A protein has these predicted regions:
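A glycine-rich helix N-cap at a beta->alpha junction
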Residues: 1-7
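Conserved phosphate-binding loops in nucleotide/dinucleotide-binding enzymes
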Residues: 10-14, 37, 116-117, 135-146, ...
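Active-site cores that bind ATP or allylic diphosphates and position pyrophosphate for catalysis
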Residues: 13, 26-169, 175-181, 189
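A generic secondary-structure signal for well-formed alpha-helical elements
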Residues: 28, 32-35, 47-50, 54, ...
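Structural motif
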Residues: 193-201, 240-246, 278-287, 364-372
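Short alpha-helical scaffolding segments that buttress acidic/His motifs in well-ordered protein cores
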Residues: 206-207, 233, 254, 288-295, ...
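Small-residue-rich helix-loop
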Residues: 263-366
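Charged substrate- and nucleic-acid-binding regions of tRNA-handling and nucleotidyl-transfer enzymes
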Residues: 353-415
């Protein structure tokens, strides 16, 4: 590759430019290509006339059969030129594709494509064929939009007497029914998705399922390790129809990958995102234990944690919850009942279960359900309805000092 070199370098296109013209001139010498001296003005006029007549624009072969002497004179005079491939005028050119099968095109429908431009640079198609041959490429895997140009590729391989590679044309990935995914239009790339907090393995898994489906015993399976994909992937499963990129499906697969991480793996991946939002001491292990079952995309973690560093302003109407049978009035009562319990130095905040059981016992003592007591605690500690964990979880993440300060502030707010 370009970074480490190798036996078929150079691997940077600009460093290979000198080799293409000699291959084009070889085809000219063998009568399989020719010099074309047509000016831009002539070609523009030709195409305008063809369009006016309702024809597809194409080169008319004006320079295809120029006498050799005239060609030599014009070259000697320094006249600008391109080198064009001499496409047969009759017959058909066919090729076999692993996905689309055997395809044939009438030679009369193909243009004498340019191989070398006036500046001496090769065209994309010509450079591709020469590079692939010299680098020993055996399989050409590319988008189905290149199906139409493949016959010209094959004619070049045949002209040189080179072995034709195996073609695998893949359907495009669409943004919707009409538009292809395009970086130019702001659609996310692999790197963008990883930067947003999608797991690399999940993105790879999802992308593999775009336009491809497993067979046999794996037909209903959606989650695959890289090792499994390497083992079972086959071009037989590639669809001819375009695939539509479904961000919700990617999200679901990513969430499943997150759930399958060990607690230690999840914390390692989540910590950089946690550190973006939280700069005060918290129990990260407990936080991650609560985040992991709820997390779908790592990049969405910071917005869930914005209350740890500073308590946001909130409306006391948040304490109203029909399911938990709470109101601002009952919330004040609940928090006042919790305050002595949470102030007890013997209560170990490093043990979440101990704190929860103590709160549960207090609820039973009051003749109330757990939610009646703990829902207000969660609001008092976060100022939010949705948080990564319940009231006792948040208390243990924050520690006794912060918990007591926020509970006291909440009681004061409710009294105000």
């Amino acid at each position: 590759g370009p970074d480490i070199g190798g036996p078929v370098g150079p691997y940077v296109q600009s460093e290979r430019m000198g080799m293409f013209k000699q291959y084009a001139e070889q085809l000219v010498a063998e009568g399989k290509a020719y010099y074309c001296f047509c000016t831009e003005e002539r070609l523009e006029a030709l195409h305008a006339e063809q369009r006016a007549n309702g024809e597809m624009t194409h080169y008319d072969g004006c320079c295809r059969d120029l006498p050799e002497e005239e060609v030599r004179q014009r070259l000697a005079a320094g006249e600008p030129y391109v080198i064009r491939q001499k496409i047969p005028k009759e017959g058909v050119t066919g090729f076999d594709d692993v996905v689309y099968g055997h395809i044939e095109v009438e030679n009369s429908e193909m243009d004498d494509q340019i191989l070398i431009k006036t500046d001496g640079m090769p065209t994309y198609n010509f450079a591709n064929v020469v590079d692939d041959h010299l680098m020993g490429i055996t399989h050409v895997i590319r988008g189905s939009e290149y199906l139409s140009s493949t016959p010209k590729y094959n004619l070049l391989y045949q002209a040189f007497g080179w072995k034709i590679p195996t073609y695998i044309h893949c359907p495009p990935v669409m943004k919707d029914a009409q538009n292809k995914l395009s970086k130019r239009n702001g659609d996310a790339s692999y790197q963008d998705l990883v930067a947003k907090g999608y797991l690399s393995e999940a993105v790879m898994n999802y992308i593999c399922l775009l336009g491809w489906s497993p067979k046999g015993e794996y037909a209903e399976q959606e989650i695959f390790s890289l090792e499994e994909l390497i083992k079972i992937w086959s071009p037989d499963g590639i669809s001819k129809s375009p695939a539509i990129f479904d961000p919700l499906k990617l999200r679901a697969i990513n969430a499943e990958y997150i759930r399958r991480l060990s607690p230690e793996e999840f914390q390692k991946k989540a910590e950089p995102w946690i550190d973006q939002a939280v700069h005060t001491p918290i129990d990260k292990k407990l936080l991650c234990a609560n985040l992991q079952p709820r997390c779908e995309v790592l990049g969405e973690i910071p917005e869930q944690l914005d209350f740890f560093d500073a308590m946001p302003d909130y409306d006391v109407s948040l304490y109203t919850n029909k399911k938990q049978k709470t109101t601002p009035e009952t919330a004040r009562e609940a928090l006042e009942a919790l305050l002595p319990l949470l102030s007890d130095e013997s209560l170990d905040f490093s043990d979440r279960d101990t704190v929860f059981n103590a709160c549960k016992a207090k609820a039973e003592e009051l003749g109330k359900k757990n939610g009646w007591l703990l829902y207000p605690l969660g609001i008092a500690l976060s100022g939010k309805q949705r948080t990564p964990g319940g009231g006792t979880d948040l208390a243990c993440m924050m520690g006794r000092e912060t918990t007591l300060a926020r509970v006291k502030a909440a009681i004061e707010k409710l009294n105000g």
